[in-house]
Every structure is written in C-alpha cells, then in structure tokens.
Amino acid sequence: MFFVLTFIMAFRSVNVGVDTAPYSRIFGIIHHASSFREAIELAPLSAPIYVGICRILGLFSAEPQILIIFTALFINIGLFVFINRVSSNVVISTFCWIGLTLFYCSMNGSRQSMALVITLNALVYFARDLKSKKGWILMLIAIGIHSTCLIIAVAILGIILTDKIHESRLVLIITVIISALISIVFKGIVRVLLQFFPHYSMYGFGGAQYSIFESNGGGRIVILYIFLLAICVLWTIINKKQNESDSFHSKMLPAVVFGAVFGIFNCRNELINRALWFYIGIFITFIPAVIEKCKGLVKWIIDIIIISVLAAYSLLSLLENQNGVIPYALFWQ
C-alpha cells in the first residue's frame, strides 16, 4: 500500500492538488535565487527548512516534479514509520488516512502534511518522555517546514494532564470543558478581529461550498468532528483507567478530544479546519486502537459503522473535489 500511495502522489501532474502549482512556482523562485538568504526573502512563506530542502533539490533538477516526488516520499515514509510504531492494525490505519481525507489533503497542502508526519512521530517520543531530545528536534524541524504545527502544544499539555490523572472519563470531562471554553473565547476574539478585517470573513464563517450544510448549520464537517468525539467517548467506556499496554493512545486522549471539540465549535472556520489536520492525524492510529478493544458482535458493529462513515466521507470529498485532486493525471500525460 505504501508504494501505491507514494506512486499516486509522486507522479501526479502539477495540476493535481490545489496548492501543487503554487508550490511548484515557489520552488522555481527558490531555485533561481542567488543565495539561500535571498531565497528566504523572495519565497512567500516563513519556512527556512522547507526553503533549504528546495535549494538542495534544485541542485539535482530545476524541474518542480522533483519536489513533488520528494514530498511524496517524505510524507509516506513519515506516515508509515508512525503507523508501524504505534498502530494495532496497519491496514485500518492506512484506510483511516484515506477515509479522513488526509491522503487527498497531502496532495493539496503537501508542506503542511510534511510537518504533520514529523509532528506525529514527535508525539510518540513525547508520550514516552516529554524531555525527549529526539521529540524536540523533530518539532523544530516541523516548525521550520510549517509553523501551524505549533497548535500541537495542546497535545503536549494533554500528556501532562494524563500523567496527573489516570481516570479516562475524568480526563475526557476536563478536556471537553476546557476545549469548549477555549473555543468560545476563540470565537469571540475572531468576531472582534473580523470587525477590523472583514475581508477575512470567508475564513471565519465559511465561504467554501463544502463547509456549509444545507446553507444554514455549522458546516457539514461538524458531522465528522461529532463522529470523532463519539470515538473518544467509546475509548473511555472501554478503558476506564489508562491502558499501560497502549500508553501512547491513553496519553493522546486529551489531544483527540480537543481536536474534535474545537472542530465542532469552529467547523465553519476554514483556517482552523486545516490547522486541525494535526489532531485528525492522531485518529489514524487511535481509531484502530478503539476497534481492537471491542469484542465479539460489538467489534463487528463498530467496524462496519467506522468503515461506512469514513468511506462515505472520503467519497463525498472526492465527488466535491475539495482538494483539487480530480481529474487525476500523471505528470507525463
């Protein structure tokens, strides 16, 4: 499966993925800059490590396809390293990567997806030891590629919470309350800021077609966030206490709950939906962990529900072409 996903990503046309063409142009700007410093000044992004990667790739080829191939390898290697380290079911995790539409997103926001897979691997180290040098080095690299990964600070605070409180349901309740309060305050701040910067209202209150559910509600993606929150609740029902045999997912409980709750409150904010990729990414191994804890008929029912919901969500994303990956074309066509 690794080779299939990598092939689809690596050899796609520059027109597959909304941000693929813009990043190809940025690659050209960086490549033709006379120095690394000039490249940083000319590139319309604050990502020194990403600029450095483009400069190095430019030594081998001036064609932007080399960047597309490299990011495909980078993302998929990082993804499968993470999955193999903590997932109880590699196949289901891979399905979740596609079902949660992160695979399509990776062909759109490839730079953010690079930061995402690095951050996920950093969290594995943090779950073991918050002082992990490897974890912090990975985070610094992720920040140098896409600074939105800083939103994962909440997950780090969540690890501290689970070190203090071992009752899963209490962790759930505390996280839901804190996440809701943060969301309410955040929405208030956004409303105030939009009074001064009204041209950003399309990001704050949903200007994209796929974010609106029957043109009045909170945004259709809210259904996904509610579904993910239900999975978090199911985890706490199954694991009343922290599961020592699966300490990673026990320590990620506050993170996934925050991602779901914050998403519910801000489902019409396009920028927040994109930033929450870092939390949705944790679900690609969290969901198989929940399924594994279920037994007998319950396990089959949960399997069917999760697979059906994610398959429908993924298909709808493709039909609406939210990430610009349809029609798909190979770069030599």
PLM regions: where:
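Transmembrane alpha-helices of multi-pass, membrane-embedded glycan-processing enzymes
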Residues: 54-58, 67-78, 283
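Membrane-interface transmembrane helices that cradle and orient dolichyl/undecaprenyl
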Residues: 119-133
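Signature aromatic-anchored transmembrane alpha helix within multi-pass, membrane-resident enzymes
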Residues: 172-178, 295-315
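Alpha-helical transmembrane segments and terminal signal-anchor/GPI-anchor hydrophobic tails
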Residues: 21-24, 31, 36, 51, ...
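Membrane-interface alpha helices of multi-pass inner-membrane proteins
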Residues: 102, 134-158, 260-264
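Short hydrophobic/aromatic helix or loop-helix immediately within or flanking a transmembrane segment
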Residues: 21-29, 36-62
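Transmembrane-helix signature of polytopic, membrane-embedded enzymes
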Residues: 80-100
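Short acidic/glycine- and proline-prone juxtamembrane loop motifs at membrane-interface regions
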Residues: 107-113
